Curated annotation (Swiss-Prot):
<comment type="subunit">
    <text>Part of the 50S ribosomal subunit.</text>
</comment>
<dbReference type="InterPro" id="IPR041988">
    <property type="entry name" value="Ribosomal_uL24_KOW"/>
</dbReference>
<dbReference type="GO" id="GO:0003735">
    <property type="term" value="F:structural constituent of ribosome"/>
</dbReference>
<dbReference type="InterPro" id="IPR003256">
    <property type="entry name" value="Ribosomal_uL24"/>
</dbReference>
<keyword id="KW-0687">Ribonucleoprotein</keyword>
<dbReference type="InterPro" id="IPR014722">
    <property type="entry name" value="Rib_uL2_dom2"/>
</dbReference>
<dbReference type="InterPro" id="IPR008991">
    <property type="entry name" value="Translation_prot_SH3-like_sf"/>
</dbReference>
<dbReference type="GO" id="GO:1990904">
    <property type="term" value="C:ribonucleoprotein complex"/>
</dbReference>
<dbReference type="GO" id="GO:0019843">
    <property type="term" value="F:rRNA binding"/>
</dbReference>
<dbReference type="Pfam" id="PF17136">
    <property type="entry name" value="ribosomal_L24"/>
</dbReference>
<comment type="function">
    <text>One of two assembly initiator proteins, it binds directly to the 5'-end of the 23S rRNA, where it nucleates assembly of the 50S subunit.</text>
</comment>
<dbReference type="InterPro" id="IPR005825">
    <property type="entry name" value="Ribosomal_uL24_CS"/>
</dbReference>
<comment type="similarity">
    <text>Belongs to the universal ribosomal protein uL24 family.</text>
</comment>
<dbReference type="Pfam" id="PF00467">
    <property type="entry name" value="KOW"/>
</dbReference>
<dbReference type="InterPro" id="IPR005824">
    <property type="entry name" value="KOW"/>
</dbReference>
<dbReference type="GO" id="GO:0005840">
    <property type="term" value="C:ribosome"/>
</dbReference>
<dbReference type="GO" id="GO:0006412">
    <property type="term" value="P:translation"/>
</dbReference>
Length: 109
């Protein structure tokens, strides 16, 4: 099958980490990496990079940045019920496919 993978989690969603060192923490998805089945979440799974001085980073030193988390370790947080929830898909009357919260049946997008 050609084309891009589809995930229940997208950019700018608020998610909660289900397993791992940041379990229970939540943040906003900055980027989804489809080829590796991972997502980068704001201020979660932080790593330290030792950088040499270069043209872009003149001073160098130790930088902290977000590291990708596997998509299976994330759960979407519903905006209405503010709980981590599973996501379903349904087709509206105007033939538009949308995501919905399985707990409160609220349309997410």
């Amino acid at each position: 099958m050609k084309g891009q993978k589809s995930y229940r989690i997208k950019k700018n969603d608020t998610v909660m980490v289900v397993t791992g060192k940041d379990k229970g923490k939540s943040g906003k998805v900055l980027r989804v990496i489809y080829k590796k089945d991972r997502a980068i979440v704001e201020k979660l799974n932080m790593i330290k990079r030792h950088m040499k001085p270069s043209q872009q980073n003149r001073q160098g030193g130790i930088l902290e940045k977000e590291s990708p988390i596997h998509i299976s370790n994330l759960m979407l947080i519903c905006a209405k019920c503010t709980d981590p929830t599973r996501v379903g898909y349904k087709v509206l009357d105007d033939n538009k496919k949308v995501r919905f919260c399985k707990k409160c049946n609220e349309v997410i997008d």
